[in-house]
Curated annotation (Swiss-Prot):
This is Uncharacterized protein MTH_862. It comes from the Archaea. InterPro entries: UCP004962. To M.jannaschii MJ1183. The lineage of its organism: Archaea, Methanobacteriati, Methanobacteriota, Methanomada group, Methanobacteria.
Length: 153
């Protein structure tokens, strides 16, 4: 994979994602419940004009609609159905809490429409560190690094 663009900050992060999925109609975010759910909600809000679902781990049968409400984006009713973009969230590749790569491959096969795009959305190069670039045929990966500090008065 080759680096096409660099970005800085959450606004640009959401912007590059929005650009990457601009032609999509139905987007599936697959990730670890609790860890990845808020990221799916955040990125689904950035593309709230699309039909978005959250897939817990790799259990496609439990996919739930990501609905925009007065509180933001919330999990709605069960809403399985193929997607034209499948976004794998980085938590799936994390040791100890992630999913087996064979289960991820099955999800890709089951959930992604023919001709659809497989996207990775992660932090701190999780997919590279897990060796997933060699195991999955990503069309696009959006990675961000988090730097931070703590101040006290």
């Amino acid at each position: 994979m080759e680096k096409l663009k660099e970005f800085r900050g959450i606004k640009e992060h959401l912007g590059v994602f929005r650009e990457a999925v601009k032609d999509a109609e139905r987007i599936g975010f697959a990730g670890v419940p609790g860890v990845c759910t808020p990221f799916a909600q955040l990125f689904a809000y950035a593309v709230r004009d699309k039909d978005n679902i959250f897939i817990p781990n790799t259990d496609f049968s439990k996919a739930r609609k990501l609905e925009v409400t007065e509180y933001g984006v919330e999990l709605g009713e069960i809403s399985p159905g193929n997607v034209d973009v499948l976004v794998l969230l980085g938590g799936l590749s994390m040791p100890g809490i992630g999913s087996d790569i064979e289960d991820v491959k099955k999800l890709v096969e089951d959930a992604l429409e023919e001709g659809g795009e497989l996207m990775g959305l992660c932090y701190m190069d999780m997919f590279a560190r897990a060796g997933w670039y060699e195991l999955l045929d990503f069309d696009c990966v959006i990675n961000a690094d988090i730097d931070g500090y703590v101040l006290r008065g």
